[in-house]
A protein has these predicted regions:
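A short helix->beta-strand "capping" segment at the edge of beta-propeller domains
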Residues: 62-87, 147-152
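Residue-level detector of Asp-centered blade-edge/turn motifs that repeat once per structural unit
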Residues: 95-98, 167-169, 217-220, 273-276, ...
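N-terminal type II signal-anchor transmembrane helix
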Residues: 2-34
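Asp-box/WD-like beta-propeller blade repeats and closely related beta-sheet repeat scaffolds
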Residues: 148-171, 176-218, 229-232
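Beta-propeller domain segments
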Residues: 25-73, 111-112, 127, 132, ...
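Surface loop/turn motifs at the tips and blade-to-blade linkers of beta-strand repeat domains
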Residues: 82-85, 153-159, 199-207, 259-263, ...
Length: 383
């Protein structure tokens, strides 16, 4: 009997040791083998895949900018504080009179139960993204042109995780996480006097993992909205991804909406090349294929484009985690124009034509890189 009990004890100990070693191996962070520069450009390195059971987690502590300090600017440029005291400013929109609108928002309330929910809640809190959303758009005004806003007012309140803004004629459009709203715009107002009209509902069901809704107006007045996927690679079922991982087209005059381009995991920033009808976007690609995959990117978007998500990435590389493979779609996958490095998380973009930044910066695009949470070493955190 003792021999049997001893055998069972040894067997259990071995199982625990094997399980512990396996868990350790599976959860070890994947250290990048290539630099962000090598993973960027028109022909970035396509590293070998490392399918992760647990993501590499590397979330920097948020400290903010101390008084008197600012980001380091490139030679010939300078940075100064325009306004402060904002609550998670997400996007900005400059009105024709020079006033600056700022969307202040966080993720809408989410279910934080279960292991996944608790882990995500902890990560967001560490990154400074916890708490209740301000759900407002503030107006900043620099009347004397000294580069500092003297006026800061709550322009629109009571929104639902607002993100994108666009002005067409005398109508200001605001993209909430769940709907596109239209407000009557009156130049010079410091508080919106008009009431909103809902134009269309936007995808926001499920976990609403990528909740931001970027927005840009085309030269003809139509609107384009970037909607991120509700998952990493469609693991919760593609029925939850209807009109997600897409750029949507909205025609406000008759409240018509359709999918303009698809297979784009999270098209956060949208902008038109100045003087043209050519639409561009910056995209956050998928996770858990290692620290070197997949490069986020900058690319143009035309009607009917398909960028491969979730089955493919970067023009046709297969993601083996997605089943069944959609081989019939592979021939239609468009390759992005420019890689921005893996996990750099590009959020905002603007073209520099017409800006007073000097000749060196007069013909290009500025892209704000939020920075990684799942890469070792960290990447991004720059413009």
């Amino acid at each position: 009997m003792r021999k049997i009990l001893k055998f069972i004890a040894v067997a259990l100990l071995l199982l625990v040791l094997i399980g512990g070693v396996t868990l350790y191996i599976m959860s070890r962070p994947d250290v990048a083998r290539f630099s962000t520069a090598e993973l960027s450009g028109r022909v970035p390195v396509m590293a070998s895949q490392k399918t992760e059971t647990f993501p590499t987690i590397n979330v920097p502590e948020v400290t903010g900018w101390p008084a008197g300090q600012s980001p380091r600017a490139a030679q010939g440029l300078s940075v100064q504080r325009f306004a402060d005291g904002l609550d998670h400013p997400r996007t900005m929109f400059v009105l024709p009179n020079g006033d600056v609108l700022v969307a202040e928002a966080q993720s809408p309330p989410r279910d934080s139960s279960g292991i996944e929910g608790k882990v995500m809640s902890r990560l967001m809190s560490k990154a400074g993204a916890g708490g209740v959303s301000a759900n407002r758009i503030s107006l900043l005004r620099d009347a004397d042109g000294d580069g500092k806003a003297e006026v800061k007012t709550a322009y629109i309140t009571g929104l639902s995780s607002p993100y994108g803004m666009a002005l067409v004629g005398d109508t200001l459009y605001v993209a909430n996480t769940d709907a596109l709203l239209a407000f009557p715009y009156v130049a010079g107002e410091t508080k919106m006097s008009g009431k909103p009209t809902k134009v269309v509902d936007l995808p926001a069901k499920g976990t609403n993992r990528h909740w931001t809704k970027s927005l840009v107006a085309a030269p003809n007045g139509w609107l384009y909205i970037g909607v991120g996927a509700d998952s990493n690679i469609g693991e919760k079922g593609m029925n939850r991804e209807f009109r997600r991982a897409s750029v949507l087209e909205v025609r406000p005059e008759n409240k018509y909406m359709r999918t303009f381009a698809a297979g784009i995991r999270n098209p956060v920033g949208l902008a038109y090349y100045p003087g043209s009808d050519r639409l561009w976007t910056v995209v956050n690609e998928r996770d858990m294929l290692g620290s070197d995959l997949v490069p986020d990117y900058l690319t143009d978007v035309t009607e009917g484009d398909f960028y491969g998500w979730p089955w493919y990435y970067w023009g046709g590389f297969v993601d083996p985690r997605v089943e069944p493979e959609a081989e019939d779609r592979r021939q239609y996958v468009k390759r992005p124009e420019y890689g921005l490095g893996a996990h750099t998380a590009p959020l905002g973009m603007t073209f520099t034509q017409g800006l007073d930044l000097g000749e060196r910066w007069s013909n290009g695009a500025l892209v704000a890189l939020h920075g990684s949470w799942n890469r070792e070493p960290a990447a991004g955190y720059s413009v």
